[in-house]
Amino acid sequence: QLNLIKGLSDDAYFSKPIITSYPRGFEVINLENEEFKLDSIDDLVYSIAYRKDSMFMRDLFSRQIGRPLKTDQPVHGYLLAAGCLFADGCFVEEVPYDPNYYFYGEEISMMLRAFTKGFSIFHTPNIPIFHLYNNDPETSGRQLHWNPDEDKNRITKWHELEKQSIQRLTDLIEA
């Protein structure tokens, strides 16, 4: 990924590339014994697109989805995955993480701010990160942010944080 960033950034048109994708998945086989099954066979490029069933589902927020493409070459894109991106170190200074986003709105905000700072988004095959897409706490050994047990100890509940996040995204877009 680092060599690809270097190669892309040598092109004056794409001098500030971001490599991003929704990572391939993995399954927990046995958490106690640290046994996992990685989806390492899938080497397609996954572009990120808006989900047709979730366009503007909450004000200006639309959900995203990874879409497989039949290519082994990098693809120029427009959306990013906040949990999986590679870029030059200047990215964290020019597009700093905004802690006022809570789940919804984070990726769209980051993409808009990156675009306005001259960054270009690319999706590539074989991203070296895997993600647990399983929501079952029994299998994964973790609670998710919307779990009632997690939420009861918060001063501000997750649904209120989500509402504030979507309003922040709306304010960014309408500014």
Predicted feature locations:
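Conserved donor NDP-sugar-binding/catalytic core segment of glycosyltransferases
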Residues: 1-56, 120
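Beta-strand-rich binding-surface signature
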Residues: 16, 82-84, 100, 118
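Catalytic lobes of large eukaryotic enzymes
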Residues: 47, 51-67, 134, 141-148
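A recurrent flexible, glycine/aromatic-enriched loop bordering the glycosyltransferase active site
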Residues: 61-86
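Active-site rim elements
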Residues: 74-76, 96-101, 156-157
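Extended amphipathic secondary-structure runs
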Residues: 83-96, 175
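Donor nucleotide-sugar recognition loop
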Residues: 90-123, 127-130
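Active-site-adjacent helix/loop segment of glycosyltransferases
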Residues: 119-175
